[in-house]
Design a protein with these regions (language model features):
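Surface/interface-facing alpha-helical segments and adjacent flexible terminal/loop regions used
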Residues: 1-59, 63-160
Length: 160
């Protein structure tokens, strides 16, 4: 039955499981009723979802930085704003343990692949660095200012 409810109505299932876990925490004996396999799966998925969200936000930020580099005469104000928002949102969701699993080089490769296939006014981007110039410390910026975006752009030019 728990497996059927998990598949049919995950919201009801999660409410019931939360209630059972609260009762268990108060010392009641409810072990048999808890859908342990799915509870464990859901707890694990929370961490994965958060990591994927941060990876996505960082990829989008890098994408906009690469657009700024690739088309210096493009809509820079918009791209700068987008990069700042994505970096800020990523920093807000960041947790220290993510450092072990998030690889800036992979995020950069994804963003570079997207931007390298784009055109702006029928023009391809200026040459984009092949190697990721960023560390996680460069990218996790709680409230990025214009100067932070400028510093990240300089990394693309100088490789620093």
């Amino acid at each position: 039955m728990p497996d059927d409810l998990y598949t049919a109505d995950i919201l009801l299932w999660s409410d019931q499981q939360a209630d059972l876990l609260r009762r268990l925490a108060r010392g009641e004996r409810v072990n048999d009723a808890i859908d342990w396999d799915h509870v464990i799966e859901e707890v694990e998925s929370v961490g994965r979802s958060e990591r994927h969200a941060v990876e996505s936000l960082l990829t989008r930020a890098i994408e906009h930085l690469l657009k700024l580099h690739g088309w210096p005469d493009g809509p820079g104000g918009h791209w700068r704003h987008e990069a700042r928002v994505f970096l800020s949102d990523a920093a807000a969701r960041w947790t220290p343990s993510m450092r072990q699993t998030i690889e800036p080089a992979l995020l950069y490769a994804t963003a570079r692949g997207l931007v390298s296939r784009m055109t702006v006014d029928e023009r391809p981007p200026a040459p984009l660095p092949a190697v990721c110039p960023y560390t996680l410390d460069d990218l996790i910026v709680p409230r990025p200012a214009v100067a932070d975006i400028d510093a990240l752009l300089a990394h693309l030019t100088t490789g620093v």
